């Protein structure tokens, strides 16, 4: 009976989702005429494939065969794991999942066909084309139109298509809120290009918690409502880990509601972390906008020691270039001869950590621009079904050298000089050699978070094994290791390395953010000292009052015996380089790769480089009439944009989003007002009372809002009643989030302003006059047209509510000059205007 009912349901799905009609009696008769074959759902899908291929429906046959591939893949590799099972051995939940996958992938075929296709790239460079760096090429290729045919340059406003959206269970709450708060439902322009992973808070140890259950329910609802093909569920992978290993490709443009989205730069993708509402608009439309940024180039030279990984490399970069210097408001492009010697995992760690490299939190691009030999890691579930030809070709070009391209600055980093480093709490650029700080005492050692890659975990285990062989004893302390995904767990288990971690006293929770975020099952105690291989060492990051220093996994492993900082080089002398490389090769083979794809290996394929196709301004005419956003603005009668009259609350440089709104408060605060009740509660507990008493203008310093991409930070300020933030500079994501939620942010760099703008001082912000008055002095500021339009329309979500899929077309029109009277339909209470120049 189960077989019959399931067969009927699959036939119905084929009819409804794929417009495919297969007679029930034909399929059942076909199934019955195959003696000696297993009688189960796998065989049913095989037979459907055969029938469709016999009917000449190769595309639909490939869809079902892809579903079949997922069905038989092991669960730890993201499949259902029912290969060879009979009807009696497959439960109802699994049958329901097979039907869902069939429906979702058939829908994906239609959504892909309806989406915008990128133009075919050029096989040869246009002789009139001027050189561009990789970021410019990717943005230009994804642009609906460019202002000139020769190239794009820094400052150009581009409306672009996107390739992927990624999110966590926690950021999905904010994404969903941005539309449901306006009585809209979440939607996706393509149901096969939304990667959603439960990793930030959910944990098997807390599945019973009501808040965690709500997050899990949110994941499942998103999967069903959007017919998602790429919903990873809970604790399968940290959102960045398997996305980069399985889905990201060179040349792609990726948006994510997490600041570490830039991890996909490891494979030469342009991957950008944004706020939840920004990403939700991208998910709904398949579009977004950027101003082309400036770019700096870092060339790697020399050869690193075999045990030096990406964490020590990026700590070396931080040590030399510091934060908020050359990379501020810019993209970073890595290349040089030394890049060829860095594995994909090493590049992942470098890319992942670049979100803390510069507190302006620019989206960091990590191409390997001179490398023609290293291919990315592919696994069984790589989506072969719908290859985007132009993207695949462009991905090859990601390895090209960009002679003559424009870079704001160029630097060289000698990999031969990289050694084990440690970043001292609470700053990621307070870096020094481990050898200079040995003996520091710790209460706990943590190996994990997305920045800790598979090869890091393998090497750390071999360091532990070397210590055990020496007879080193374990002193009292807490030890935790959290691999980034179940596929990595599977590989470590097969190599016997999980047993080594266990022998050394390491707890082994499920894949997730764990102590790197400190809001789930693992929270460091107040006052405790930790050594960690995570990516951030900000104040209160691992837990309220906890102190965390960051370094490589190998350094953590070496230090975890006596719980004091130990240079790993001594134990590394006992580790065989050959064994290490053999283990990495076995991991790669287990994922469906080959040894030839390891760093330094030879690529069998002949590489053909191509150039992006640039569409001119006249390409817009094919889209039809686009309504001006000004025309869609809500009328507020004759009300004019008034001035803000308030008192100042003064803050310092580098105010991070963890300070503005602690991560635990984001979980249980669905409204702006609830978020506001937790604003600065750990670092400035008097802040809320000051705002309520009239200090509604914040004056900050450099890189205000650095750190996490959480949109809850400006929402918390808004919910508390803050009307305006003035700073020397804003972190990219925070600065973009402010107008997206309808809030006013102003950049002022005049030193005289900051001398005059003291705590408690009266201040007037005259938005119509574009000036700030304080202490008898007047300071002008500028307004960005796009941000002004967003704020006049109550933010991006409200603009999308008015204009739907045309929202970015309207935003990216070249606006006519706006008279002052055009500002009459916005009020400061609803966000006011914006006073900063958006450089990207």
Swiss-Prot record:
[4Fe-4S] cluster binds at residues 450, 513, 516. It is an enzyme of class 4 (lyase). GO terms for molecular function: hydro-lyase activity; iron-sulfur cluster binding; metal ion binding. Pathway: Mycotoxin biosynthesis. It comes from the Eukaryota. Substrate binds at residues 258-260, 536, 541, 709-710. Keywords: Iron, Iron-sulfur, Lyase, Metal-binding, Virulence. The keyword Hydrolase does not apply. The keyword Iron-sulfur applies. Its EC number is 4.2.1.-. Induction: Expression is up-regulated more than 10 fold in toxin producing cultures. PROSITE patterns: ACONITASE_2. GO terms for biological process: L-amino acid biosynthetic process; proteinogenic amino acid biosynthetic process. PANTHER family: HOMOACONITASE, MITOCHONDRIAL, HOMOACONITASE, MITOCHONDRIAL-RELATED. Gene clusters encoding host-selective toxins (HSTs) are localized on conditionally dispensable chromosomes (CDCs), also called supernumerary chromosomes, where they are present in multiple copies. The CDCs are not essential for saprophytic growth but controls host-selective pathogenicity. Belongs to the aconitase/IPM isomerase family. NCBIfam families: LEUD_arch. Aconitase; part of the gene clusters that mediate the biosynthesis of AM-toxins, host-selective toxins (HSTs) causing Alternaria blotch on apple, a worldwide distributed disease. AM-toxins are cyclic depsipeptides containing the 3 residues 2-hydroxy-isovaleric acid (2-HIV), dehydroalanine, L-alanine which are common for all 3 AM-toxins I to III. The fourth precursor is L-alpha-amino-methoxyphenyl-valeric acid (L-Amv) for AM-toxin I, L-alpha-amino-phenyl-valeric acid (L-Apv) for AM-toxin II, and L-alpha-amino-hydroxyphenyl-valeric acid (L-Ahv) for AM-toxin III. This is Aconitase AMT8.
């Amino acid at each position: 009976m189960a077989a019959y009912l399931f067969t009927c349901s699959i036939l119905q799905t084929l009819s409804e989702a794929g417009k495919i009609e297969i007679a029930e009696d034909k399929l059942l008769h076909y199934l019955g005429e195959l003696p000696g074959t297993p009688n189960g759902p796998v065989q049913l899908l095989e037979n459907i494939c055969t029938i469709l291929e016999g009917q000449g429906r190769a595309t639909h046959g490939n869809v079902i065969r892809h579903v079949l591939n997922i069905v038989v893949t092991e669960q730890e590799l993201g499949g259902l794991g029912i290969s060879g099972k009979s009807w009696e051995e497959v439960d109802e939940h699994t049958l329901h999942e097979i039907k869902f996958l069939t429906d979702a992938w058939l829908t994906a075929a239609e959504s892909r066909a309806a989406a915008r296709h990128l133009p075919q790239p050029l096989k040869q460079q246009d002789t009139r084309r001027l050189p561009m760096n990789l970021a410019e090429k990717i943005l230009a290729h994804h642009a609906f139109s460019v202002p000139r045919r020769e190239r794009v340059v820094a400052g150009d406003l581009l409306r672009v298509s996107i390739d992927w959206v990624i999110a966590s269970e926690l950021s999905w709450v904010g994404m969903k809120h941005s539309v449901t708060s306006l009585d809209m439902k979440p939607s996706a322009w393509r149901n096969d290009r939304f990667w959603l992973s439960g990793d930030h808070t959910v944990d098997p140890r807390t599945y019973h918690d009501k808040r965690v259950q709500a997050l899990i329910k949110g994941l499942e609802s998103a999967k069903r409502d959007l017919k998602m093909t790429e919903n990873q569920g809970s604790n399968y992978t940290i959102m960045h880990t398997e996305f980069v290993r399985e889905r990201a490709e060179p040349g792609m443009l990726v948006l994510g509601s997490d600041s570490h989205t830039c991890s996909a730069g490891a494979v030469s993708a342009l991957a950008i972390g944004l706020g939840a509402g920004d990403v939700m608009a991208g998910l709904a439309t398949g579009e977004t906008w950027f101003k082309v940024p400036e770019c700096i180039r870092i060339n790697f030279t020399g050869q690193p020691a075999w045990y030096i990984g990406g964490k020590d490399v990026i700590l070396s970069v931080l040590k030399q270039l510091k934060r908020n210097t050359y990379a501020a408001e810019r993209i970073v492009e890595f290349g040089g001869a030394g890049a060829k010697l860095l594995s994909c995992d090493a590049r992942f760690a470098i890319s992942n950590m670049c979100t803390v490299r510069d507190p302006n939190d620019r989206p960091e691009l990590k191409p390997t621009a001179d490398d023609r030999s290293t291919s990315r890691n592919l696994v069984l579930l790589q989506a072969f079904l719908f290859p985007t030809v132009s993207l695949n070709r462009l991905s090859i070009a990601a390895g090209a050298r960009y002679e003559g391209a424009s870079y704001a600055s160029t630097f060289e980093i000698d990999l031969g000089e990289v050694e084990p480093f440690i970043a001292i709490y609470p700053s990621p650029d307070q870096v020094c050699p481990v050898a200079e700080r040995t003996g520091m005492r710790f209460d706990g050692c943590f190996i994990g978070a997305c920045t800790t890659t598979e090869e890091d975990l393998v090497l750390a285990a071999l360091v532990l094994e070397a210590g055990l062989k020496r007879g080193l004893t374990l002193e009292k302390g807490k030890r935790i290791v959290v691999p980034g995904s179940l596929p990595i767990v599977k590989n470590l288990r097969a190599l016997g390395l999980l047993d080594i971690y266990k022998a050394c006293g390491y707890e082994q929770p499920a894949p997730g953010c764990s102590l790197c975020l400190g809001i789930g099952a693992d929270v460091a105690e107040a006052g405790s000292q930790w050594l960690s291989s995570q990516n951030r060492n900000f104040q209160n990051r691992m837990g309220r009052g906890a102190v965390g220093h960051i370094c490589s996994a190998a350094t953590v492993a070496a230090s975890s015996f006596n719980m004091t900082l130990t240079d790993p080089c001594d134990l590394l002398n006992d580790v065989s380089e050959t064994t290490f490389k053999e283990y990495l090769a076995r991991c790669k083979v287990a994922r469906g790769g080959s040894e030839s794809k390891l760093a330094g290996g030879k690529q069998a394929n002949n590489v053909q480089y191509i150039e992006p196709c640039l569409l001119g301004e006249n390409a817009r005419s094919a889209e039809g009439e686009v309504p001006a956003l000004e025309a869609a603005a809500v009328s507020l009668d004759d009300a004019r944009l008034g001035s803000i009259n308030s008192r100042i609350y003064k803050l310092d440089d580098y105010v991070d989003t963890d300070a503005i709104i602690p991560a635990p408060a984001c979980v249980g605060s669905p409204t702006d007002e609830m978020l506001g009740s937790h604003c600065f509660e750990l670092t400035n507990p008097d802040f809320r009372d000051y705002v309520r008493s009239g200090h509604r203008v914040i004056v900050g310093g450099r890189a205000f809002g650095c750190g996490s991409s959480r949109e809850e930070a400006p929402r918390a300020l808004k919910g508390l009643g803050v009307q305006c933030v003035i700073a020397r500079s804003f972190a990219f994501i925070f600065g973009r989030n402010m107008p997206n939620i309808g809030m006013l942010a102003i950049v002022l760099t005049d030193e005289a302003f900051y001398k005059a703008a003291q705590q408690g001082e009266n201040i007037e912000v005259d938005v119509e006059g574009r000036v700030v008055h304080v202490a008898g002095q007047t300071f002008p500021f500028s307004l960005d047209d796009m941000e002004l339009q967003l704020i006049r329309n109550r933010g991006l979500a409200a603009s999308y509510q008015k204009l739907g899929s045309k929202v970015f077309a309207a935003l990216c029109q070249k606006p006519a000059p706006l008279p002052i009277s055009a500002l009459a339909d916005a009020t400061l209470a609803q966000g006011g205007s914006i006073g900063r120049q958006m450089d990207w």
